[in-house]
């Protein structure tokens, strides 16, 4: 049994089924600009942000032009807020949040996306999720794989890093959790673990509901 006091959630692809929709938007917009995305594009950008994301996109021809378009389309609050209730929920989302609250765990949502975007996704859940903190990418200086976002989350929740379990679906997030000195659980969405990830993944489950078994 893990000695955990707080659970830190990533958002896109972990709590909500947004990655496939987002990936299609990236592909469509790249096509409009006249190029095809590299094969490793999504494993490099998923969960990333800030300088790390800018550095990668700058290495791709037309990458920054694409990013300017995507900043408007990908994070269109009105689009995500208008989606049918519970349509984006990942399996076990409501069950896990309810169980964690019933058992006294502190809950943080730590996403590379802006807080307003995270709140828009949360508004699509029919049963309001109870949580203790949201840390958005616009609230930190360094994006994942830097551990800052998770360390800020732990500080807000008043727990030690070693008392946190991070739930992630991205390479950048898993690396950030390790660097933060936290436990991590990988739940696969669109990214299959590469060699680096496999070395860093501590636990892995098929869905959010199975996380309960780790904590019992």
Q: What is the predicted role of each segment?
A:
Residues 32, 43-44, 83, 108, ...:
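Short, flexible active-site loop motifs that bind/organize anionic cofactors or intermediates
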Residues 58, 79-80, 105, 136-139, ...:
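A broad detector of the eukaryotic-type serine/threonine protein kinase catalytic domain
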Residues 14-15, 84-85, 107, 138-139, ...:
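A generic structural signal for short
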Residues 2-99, 103, 128:
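N-terminal helical cap/lid subdomain that shapes the substrate entry/recognition surface
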Residues 1-5, 98-101, 114-216:
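Asp-based, Mg2+/Mn2+-dependent phosphohydrolase catalytic module
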């Amino acid at each position: 049994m893990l000695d955990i006091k707080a659970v830190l959630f990533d958002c896109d692809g972990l709590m909500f089924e947004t990655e496939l929709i987002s990936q299609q938007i990236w592909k469509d917009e790249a096509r409009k600009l006249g190029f095809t995305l590299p094969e490793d594009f999504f494993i490099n950008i998923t969960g990333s942000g800030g300088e790390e994301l800018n550095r990668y996109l700058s290495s791709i021809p037309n990458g920054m032009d694409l990013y300017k378009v995507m900043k408007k389309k990908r994070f269109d609050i009105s689009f995500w807020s208008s989606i049918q209730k519970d349509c984006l929920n990942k399996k076990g989302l409501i069950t896990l949040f309810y169980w964690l609250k019933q058992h006294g765990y502190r809950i943080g949502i730590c996403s590379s996306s802006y807080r307003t975007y995270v709140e828009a996704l949360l508004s699509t859940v029919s049963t309001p999720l109870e949580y203790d903190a949201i840390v958005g990418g616009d609230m930190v200086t360094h994006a994942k794989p830097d551990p800052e976002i998770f360390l800020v989350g732990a500080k807000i929740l008043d727990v030690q890093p070693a008392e946190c379990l991070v739930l992630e679906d991205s390479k950048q997030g898993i690396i950030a959790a390790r660097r933060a000195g936290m436990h991590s659980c990988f739940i696969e969405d669109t990214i299959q673990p590469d060699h680096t990830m496999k070395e860093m993944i501590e636990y892995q489950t098929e869905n959010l509901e199975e996380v309960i078994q780790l904590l019992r």
